Amino acid sequence: MNFPGMPGGAAPSGGAAPGGYDPNDPNIKMMQKAMESCFAKTVMSGGAGFALGGVFGMFMASMAYDTPYHSPTTPGTGPGANPAAAGIPGYKPVDLSSMPLKEQLKHGFKDMGQRSYSTAKNFAKVGALFSGIECGIEGLRAKNDLGNGVAAGCLTGAILAKNGGPQAAAVGCAGFAAFSAAIDAWMRMPSEED
């Protein structure tokens, strides 16, 4: 099927592949080389992590309002408010559900945006860190096997948990390495079609 502006028909023998794609074109080779660089992989993983984290954070924030643990908005909380006002006798917090609809929506969207952005930053950091480390390890070892993902997972987990001390870094290393090994092993399984 041909679409307007798209080349159609079969490729001549020995020439370009179907659709006008020539794998020997120097521009295509340059683009492939750029996309295979560690920098490009890290940036793409960080961007994909940011997008996925934003959607995930928005979804989780939308589910948080039906729990009794959600902190309601109170008068006097916000920029310039006195946090000690909660200890004043007679001070009663205003429940979110008793506010006007416009205020509820304003609070809900603001909270969703903050949570979504926070989750997006975290996913981007994890994705970029793991991808960059894995690509670096793959370049050093000159192999593409399960060991790269396990080592990258260990280093990523340890780096993310470094502020918790050496024990937290060891647990982070073990957890990320195990998760990475499980996902990588599943991704490398032969398909049912093979």
Curated annotation (Swiss-Prot):
Keywords: Disulfide bond, Membrane, Mitochondrion, Mitochondrion inner membrane, Protein transport, Translocation, Transmembrane, Transmembrane helix, Transport
Gly residues: bias regions: 1-18
Cystine crosslinks: 38-135, 154-173
GO biological process per UniProt: protein insertion into mitochondrial inner membrane
Protein name, per record: Mitochondrial import inner membrane translocase subunit tim22
Any one GO molecular function term: protein transmembrane transporter activity
Pfam families linked to this entry: Tim17
Stretches the record annotates as Disordered: 1-24
Main location: mitochondrion
Ranges that cross the membrane: 43-63, 145-161, 167-187
Locations listed in the record: Mitochondrion inner membrane
